[in-house]
Amino acid sequence: MKNIILIGMPGCGKSTLGRRLAGALHRSFVDADTYLEEKEGKSIPELFAVSEDCFRDAEERTIEALAKRESLVIATGGGVVKRAVNIERLKKTGTIYFIDRRPEDIAGDVEVSTRPLLAEGSAKVYTLYHERIALYRKAADEIVVNEGSLESVLEKLTKLAIRGQGDHLMRITGL
């Protein structure tokens, strides 16, 4: 079965929603950033300390590896859209869902100091959002607005994912 790929800003809910979605659909969940750190043997801040290009190269290798697998729910890093090759690879084996969360909600909810690109403060959230929003929309097969309760957003995402996977998943989940 095709992969279900979640893209969006850091702090938009990709990992939280991805874990819950994978459980609901009886699939394996992969957080691409965690996978990257395990494969590279370095943390994301360590890779960024070398350079952003160093990190983006590692991210590209990660996406190449994950795109070769099937039936996963993948939460990507927020900047995966910065390299078109990543999106091309992901689209070949999956459906891409943009988790769109307002920058003011991210800034008010996320510990930005733990995220390398947001370490400059919450103002960076707005800058990144405006830099990337067109890339997220272009890459997405579906857009899921992350507002309201986690359960309501998860329900919307689950229904879209099931529809995107066809009748086989509807029979498995009973939806």
What feature does the model see in each segment?
Residues D31-V80, A84-E88, L135:
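ATP-dependent small-molecule kinase phosphotransfer cores
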Residues G23-A32:
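Post-Walker A helix-loop "phosphate-sensing" segment adjacent to the P-loop in P-loop NTPases
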Residues G13:
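Conserved glycine(s) of the Walker
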Residues G78-V80, R102-E104, S149:
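Short glycine-rich anion-binding loops that position phosphate/pyrophosphate groups of nucleotides
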Residues T16, R20, A24, R69, ...:
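NTP-dependent small-molecule kinase module
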Residues L6:
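Hydrophobic anchor at the beta1->P-loop junction of P-loop NTPases
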Residues M9:
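P-loop (Walker A) phosphate-binding loop of NTP-binding proteins
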Residues T93-A134:
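A glycine- and Lys/Arg-enriched "phosphate-lid" helix/loop adjacent to the NTP-binding pocket
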